[in-house]
Amino acid sequence: GKRLRPMLTLACARMCGYEGADHVKLAATVEFIHTATLLHDDVVDESAQRRGRPTANLLWDNKSSVLVGDYLFARAFQLMVEPGDLRVLDILSNAAATIAEGEVLQLSAAQNLATDEAVYLQVIRGKTAALFSAATEVGGVIAGRPEEEIKALFDFGDALGVAFQMVDDLLDYWGSEATGKNVGDDFRERKLTLPVIKAVAQADAEERAFWKRTIEKGRQEDGDLAQALALLEPSLDGLARAAGALRDALLQVHCQAFVALAVVGAVVRRNRDDVFVVGILLPRPLQPGADDAEADGQDVGVGQAQLRDHAL
């Protein structure tokens, strides 16, 4: 894995001037929570591959995966109380609960073509962005920063988490082995992610019947994934533009976070290396036609290579 979430905790704490060692324990806590949810998710989804490798439940069994996930959750709670900060405990324990709530909401919304973008955003804010925002927020809390700075760090983590999950869902249809994605898993698991939600909203009667058969009723046949990709392709440019717009919003939140930190002037200057670490975690903008345009410079849309490049 990429260890993005614990890296955020470490970098944000140092960026805020923290000089102790408890941020390492909190970073480990964040990663333990994340890994535990992955182990449980793979059991729920009956997944056979993650990050291009066989899942634990495939290599061993569901019982082992669930028990190891439970152990990691328990260790996470042991670690999060060690700094002796009740607010840190509140943030991380709430994040763990919110992740579970997000997964339950996703399960209840699955296979339901009535699921819209508002529900989708609620799901990804729960199951993904909650841990990103907790990871950045505790960095400011443990450093004893003012409330406006802590709020800015929370907003930054929330926006980054939403962007991360949106791009991850795009890559499930337009990714490759290089991104560690097993293309089509969400389709086979009948998940209503943003690409399908967009396609269903624009579908005619015949296309809607296809999505109803494959997603709602689960009657999938050979060639259905290829047909799904063909139906999704017209919305690719719009989805990429949406991701680019989200990235712009994320950059704005990023700047707001650093403006808040700059209230203390010397903090950002003294910890500029950690500011850089946080900055490079941002996805690059999606530019229409960058890898598909012909020599004459014609804008012919956003290509799959760009989406692969945005895997975090």
Q: Where are the language model's segments positioned?
A:
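Sequence-pattern detector for short linear motifs
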Residues: 78, 130, 191-193, 244, ...
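Glycine-rich loops and low-complexity Gly/Arg-rich segments
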Residues: 63, 92, 266, 302-303
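Short C-terminal domain-edge/linker segments immediately following a structured domain
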Residues: 67-69, 309-312
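All-alpha prenyltransferase/terpene-synthase fold signal
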Residues: 1-253, 260
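Short, strongly patterned local motifs
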Residues: 265, 269-273, 278-283
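Alpha-helix boundary/capping motif
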Residues: 253-257, 272-276, 288, 292-300, ...
